[in-house]
Amino acid sequence: MSSAEHIGVTFRSYQPGDLEVIKRITVEAFSGVSIDEAAELAFGPINGHDWQWRKARHIDADVAREVDGILVVESEQGEVVGYITSWQDTAAGIGYIPNLAFVPEWRGRGLGRLLIQRVLDRFRASGLSHAKIETLAQNDVGHHLYTSIGFREV
């Protein structure tokens, strides 16, 4: 398995200045595979807001829920190129990975796998017995990645 350093990136903790770029990455990466987009296609904009607005708000919720569960991927040039969000329900013994995304030119390099492994290691260190990640059926890339790591469809 490649390390982040060999790929030319650094994994670091989330900083408040990352919020807007992470939202932009999210909206771009989730086009075609977002439940919010599917809902908009079925029902139109909801309450006057498009799916991109709703999806970006998921990042606000992730930051509010567990800011320490966010890892950011930064290129050697200091550009944020991807991220993962996670949170832990220690009472239930479950860790959640709600969002994982990269800018297009950084996809397919194994970084998503590395981020998920880091998060799963954190979950295990916290004594969690299960992890949950969700995706739509049309997200072939996500399905392949998640099952190759050991997630099972339920």
Task: Identify what each model region corresponds to.
Residues G110:
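Conserved G/P- and acidic residue-centered "switch" motifs that form tight phosphate/ATP-binding loops
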Residues M1-G8:
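Acyl-donor-binding surface of acyltransferase catalytic domains
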